[in-house]
Design a protein with these regions (language model features):
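Bacterial N-terminal signal peptides
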Residues: 2-13
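Cell-envelope and extracellular/periplasmic
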Residues: 20-516
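Sec/Tat signal peptide C-region and signal peptidase I cleavage site
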Residues: 14-19
Length: 516
């Protein structure tokens, strides 16, 4: 998908916007941050065939609008600046729009489900974080449009200046990441987010991408059919029947308050709030592109961990890869892209290990990174509160790879291959940063080894430089090894910087089915 094609797509889908007046895309508003050192795309609407001029930082560029009034132009790159400036758009008959208090710095987009949406107000040590949040050079924009069945050109959001009063609403993961970038790079930081709890990755992928890929087409069509077929009236009628049955059982002493059917209005709002396949891409991502960014952060996967196991174990890997490549195409830029690997948490089946594996495999894409969080989750809370460390680990990757800064490590250890010799398997790692080590100084736990019978046995592990040698007295001829392959695994292996190793497996045996 070329940049010119993206422009045509955006122009052709103006979703009912009638350009009777000069307008800028919603994200171009007071207190915004523009990306430094890259050409800046600015767009909006006016009358057809109208000349529009945009001025910023001592430069002016003009463009003639399309037949439906949409316009795009590119400003030359600007240096980072904490000095408030104005971005001005001018049209015919003296029409003018002025965006005030515009800074230039580093802009990152964060998206995903509830762990990306989780606010600073819900994270660890909020009172201390609140007191330290007088950081006016950090700005935050949250896109909050309702899910839609078609791509929407107009967004819903506003820029906020970081302060002790506003920070409680900011995405915790994105804020703690951005704060590290601000501290280390020393320029203004803009944080743009679009996220929604309990959402599948399918909600964030375009219909075109999902329906045209042979691996995702069937799943997309099944979800679309279920979404289109959702009958609100029938849903409420079914609730009334269930409620009547519960009342009768309750009166007979055969049921309790906890068995009462859920409020249908809340359930319907939850279903509609997530949207169908592509619903959040249409509403919250499409309108942001091609706003100039430095990179993207993704935190999602929990909801996809319940998909069927062995016959679709590849699907999240494919979907995440499509998300990266299709969003890059939409923006017309091979943006650096990192995600948070799912942390330790008590969940049924092998869904979480499978999603972690998919995330590990997706690192094959260029300019990607992953924060391994297998040691900082919460076994009972799917929303772990230590988002400070999540943001810091993401920042290590960005600072080390995007900005060329010296960091303790850009990642925890990642497996690069393995060899079998007699009764042992040697696994090799990269990102060891001073050598592998045991997190607690004791024997390495969480490793299992298996022979051709595919029966996993506890393993004995010896560290040798940047590799580990795995054996078991119960397996004479091993063929495969795995590490931390549980929802709530033993986490024992780290690099010299103390960052944990990613879970992995060397086999490709079918994964047991995971029930929804």
């Amino acid at each position: 998908m070329t940049f010119s094609f993206i422009i045509v797509l955006l122009i052709s889908r103006n979703s009912g916007l009638h350009a009777a007046e000069l307008k800028l895309a919603t994200i171009f508003s007071d207190h915004m941050v523009l990306q430094c050192d890259k050409p800046l795309t600015v767009w909006g609407w006016a009358d057809p065939d109208e000349s529009v001029t945009v001025s910023f930082g001592g430069q002016s560029k003009s463009v003639i609008t399309s037949v439906n009034g949409k316009w795009f132009l590119k400003l030359d790159p600007s240096k980072a600046s904490a000095k408030p400036q104005e971005l001005i758009a001018r049209g015919k008959e003296g029409r003018k729009l002025v965006v005030k208090d515009v800074l230039v710095g580093e802009v990152w987009f964060g998206s995903g489900q509830s762990n990306m949406a989780m606010a600073v107000g819900s994270a660890n040590n909020f009172e201390a974080e609140k007191a330290a949040a007088n950081l006016p050079l950090i700005r935050y924009y949250s896109e909050a449009s309702l899910p839609a069945d078609k791509p929407q050109a107009k967004g819903k959001g506003k820029w906020e200046i970081c302060s002790p009063e506003s920070v409680r609403r900011f995405s915790a993961t994105l804020y703690f990441f951005g704060r590290e970038i601000h501290r280390e790079v020393g320029v203004p930081v803009g944080l743009v987010t679009a996220s929604a709890g309990a959402t599948h990755v399918e909600s964030w992928l375009s219909a075109e991408v999902q329906s045209s890929d042979p691996d995702t087409k069937a799943e997309y069509e099944a979800q679309l059919k279920a979404w289109v077929g959702f009958d609100e009236a029938k849903f409420k009628a079914d609730y009334e029947k269930k409620l009547a049955a519960w009342k009768f059982a309750f009166s007979m002493g055969k049921s309790s308050e906890k068995d009462k059917p859920s409020d249908p209005d809340r359930m319907i709002a939850h279903i509609k709030g997530k949207g169908g396949p592509s619903g959040l891409f249409n509403a919250r991502v499409f309108n942001l592109a091609p706003f100039t960014l430095r990179g993207i952060i993704w935190y999602q996967g929990e909801s996809n961990s319940g998909l069927p196991g062995s016959n679709q174990k590849h699907l999240y890997h494919k979907q995440l890869s499509l998300l990266v490549t299709s969003w890059r195409e939409l923006w017309g830029d091979e943006l650096p892209f990192a995600w948070v690997q799912l942390p330790n948490f008590t969940a049924p089946g092998e869904g979480w290990p499978r999603i972690r594996e998919a995330m590990l495999k997706a690192l094959e894409l260029p300019k990607t990174g992953m924060a391994i969080t297998i040691d900082i989750g919460d076994e009972k809370d799917i929303h772990p509160k230590n988002k400070q460390e999540v943001g810091k680990r993401l920042s290590y990757w960005a600072l080390g790879t995007v900005y060329g800064k010296k960091v303790p490590a850009i990642s925890g250890p990642l497996p690069t291959g393995s060899t079998i010799s007699g009764n042992s398997i040697t696994v090799y790692f990269k990102h060891t940063n001073g050598g592998l080590k045991s997190i607690n100084g004791g024997p390495l736990a969480g490793f299992q080894i298996a022979g051709a019978d595919q029966q996993w046995k506890p393993a004995v592990v010896e560290i040798k430089g940047d590799s580990v040698v795995v054996t078991s007295p119960l397996v004479a001829q091993p063929v495969a090894v795995r590490y931390a392959w549980k929802d709530l695994p033993d986490c024992s292996l780290a690099n010299g910087a103390g960052l944990p190793a990613s879970p992995f497996r060397t086999d490709d045996w079918p994964v047991p089915q995971v029930k929804k």
